[in-house]
């Protein structure tokens, strides 16, 4: 075979066992429904060991795109760090030993920053507990947690329990919670520096609502209808109404999120650049991140450095002299580039990139179509030219609007994706492209929890694979790692030995 191929990723578009709770099943999506009738389809697993995560762990976009491009199961940081915590080897990591030794010898505070939930997408509470244990093995007595509440990868009002459990865990130690703020502010990834500033001012300047009781502060936020993701800065104070701890020059900061994308902006403000407009100034800190957030950072130490994955789909196509396009809106642009390329920022020879900005709205339920139409309109002329051999396209809507937990908006998101998928696939068929329609993980097919509350998290449901091709009549079930070998078979390019998964044709 010598086909030209489009990989169309419908982000967050899973297969629901219960149509009542599914935005997809409640939406008017005639085109995607017609694909199931007219072309072969099967399902893919995107969770747990199928993608190199711990058993039962829901997949996510970073992991999904990494597996898709790699053509193999990529063992993730979450699984690696879980093992280190379980086997109590975290305290033996040299980077942590050096940080704790520096703190002890120089009488400096240690600040743990990160998302306090067991969502397992950006962080895990077990990792924080492991770090706390390690700090106590070193006899450190000035240890503070700056807790970012989640409400997005876990239920919107689960934060109070996570904070309660953390307090319970540290009650017989000198470790204290120093501040609380929602991830909306502390973990932005869309250059909304005005949000990041609130988190920066909280941890550096102690600016926030003063409190002596972390759990009560979270519960008070719920009473005002502000859920975990959006909790406004809370600074924990002592009996003299002074902040327990802020980050000052020379302190140790350990950012314990293992996923890289949402730790970058706060890290940049604290340690890399001055942002004069926001009055955020970098501090001279002993700064440690659990994984490598960015190769270019100066003076940031990394506990677990990733091995870059070689012989990804992009690299194999480069060697075969093929032209490729990576196309997405801002929210998923790193996924179709950096993650799909196995942790590589630089484009391959023959790779071009099309980016459209995600809409500047507070939350995507306000504009559920996002920038899907702009993506379709940008890609169709390229398909009509017929010069590109492979396209990796991501429609973000099902995931990003699914995360809001608002069913009506998610339905509109699905309908926008349906219309845009039609534009692209009509052009694909007219220009002799084969399209593989898949998702990287589930989300918008489960918008409601069994108790009736909104579900904002990813799921472990299987996702579809549809093979839109004029000749081929079969496709098998598989995992995300099987997609790159499938694409190579369609394109008539030899699969490298490093790709250990197999074609689903």
Swiss-Prot record:
Q: Which cofactors does it use?
A: Mn(2+)
Q: Which residues bind Mn(2+) 1?
A: 399, 403, 458
SUPFAM superfamilies on file: 2,3-Bisphosphoglycerate-independent phosphoglycerate mutase, substrate-binding domain, Alkaline phosphatase-like
Manganese among keywords:
yes
Q: What class of enzyme is it?
A: isomerase
Kindly list the biological process annotations in GO that this record carries: glucose catabolic process; glycolytic process
Record-listed Mn(2+) 2 binding positions: 11, 61, 440-441
GO: which molecular function terms? manganese ion binding; phosphoglycerate mutase activity
Q: What does this protein do?
A: Catalyzes the interconversion of 2-phosphoglycerate and 3-phosphoglycerate.
What is this protein identified as?
Answer: 2,3-bisphosphoglycerate-independent phosphoglycerate mutase
What species is this protein from? Flavobacterium johnsoniae (strain ATCC 17061 / DSM 2064 / JCM 8514 / BCRC 14874 / CCUG 350202 / NBRC 14942 / NCIMB 11054 / UW101)
Name of the gene encoding the protein in the UniProt record: gpmI
């Amino acid at each position: 075979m010598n086909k030209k191929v489009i990989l169309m990723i419908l982000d967050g578009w899973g297969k629901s066992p219960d149509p009542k709770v599914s935005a997809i099943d409640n939406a008017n999506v005639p085109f995607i429904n017609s694909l199931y009738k007219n072309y072969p389809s099967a399902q893919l697993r995107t969770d747990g060991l199928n993608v190199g995560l711990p058993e039962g762990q829901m997949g996510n976009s970073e992991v999904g795109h990494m597996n898709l491009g790699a053509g193999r199961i990529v063992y993730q940081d979450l699984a690696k760090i879980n093992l280190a915590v379980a086997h109590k080897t975290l305290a033996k990591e040299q980077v942590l030993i050096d940080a704790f030794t520096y703190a002890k010898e120089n009488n400096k505070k240690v600040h743990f920053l990160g998302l306090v939930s067991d969502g397992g997408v950006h962080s895990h509470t077990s990792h924080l507990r492991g770090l706390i244990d390690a700090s106590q093995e070193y006899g450190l007595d000035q240890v503070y947690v700056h807790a970012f509440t989640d409400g997005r990868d876990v239920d919107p009002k689960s934060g109070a329990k996570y904070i309660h459990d953390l307090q319970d865990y540290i009650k017989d130690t000198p470790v204290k919670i120093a501040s609380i703020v929602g991830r909306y502010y502390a973990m932005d990834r869309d250059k909304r520096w005005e949000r990041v500033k609130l988190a920066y001012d909280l941890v550096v300047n102690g600016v926030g609502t003063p409190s002596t009781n972390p759990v009560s502060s979270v519960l008070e936020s719920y009473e005002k209808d502000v859920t975990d993701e959006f909790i406004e800065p809370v600074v924990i104070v002592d009996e003299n109404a002074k902040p327990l701890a802020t980050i000052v020059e020379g302190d140790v900061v350990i950012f314990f999120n293992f996923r890289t994308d949402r730790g970058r902006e706060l890290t940049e403000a604290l340690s890399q650049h001055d942002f004069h407009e926001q009055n955020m100034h970098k501090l001279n800190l002993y700064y440690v991140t659990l994984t490598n957030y960015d190769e270019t950072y100066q003076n940031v130490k990394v506990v677990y450095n990733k091995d870059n994955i070689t012989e990804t789909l992009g690299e194999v196509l480069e060697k075969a002299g093929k032209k490729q396009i990576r196309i997405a809106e801002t929210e998923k642009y790193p996924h179709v580039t950096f993650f799909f390329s196995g942790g590589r920022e630089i484009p391959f020879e023959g790779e071009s990139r099309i980016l459209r900005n995600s809409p500047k709205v507070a939350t995507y339920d306000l504009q559920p179509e996002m920038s899907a139409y702009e993506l379709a309109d940008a890609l169709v002329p390229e398909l009509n030219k017929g010069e590109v051999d492979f396209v990796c396209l991501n429609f973000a809507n099902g995931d990003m609007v699914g995360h809001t937990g608002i069913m009506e908006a998610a339905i509109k998101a699905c309908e926008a994706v349906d219309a845009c998928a039609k534009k692209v696939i009509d052009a694909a068929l007219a220009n002799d492209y084969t399209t593989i329609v898949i998702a990287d993980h589930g989300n918008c097919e489960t918008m409601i929890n069994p108790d009736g509350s909104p579900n904002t998290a990813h799921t472990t449901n299987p996702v579809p694979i549809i093979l839109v091709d004029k000749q081929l009549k079969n496709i098998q079930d598989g995992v995300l790692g099987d997609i790159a070998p499938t694409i190579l078979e369609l394109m008539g390019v030899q699969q490298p030995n490093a790709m250990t998964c197999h074609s689903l044709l």
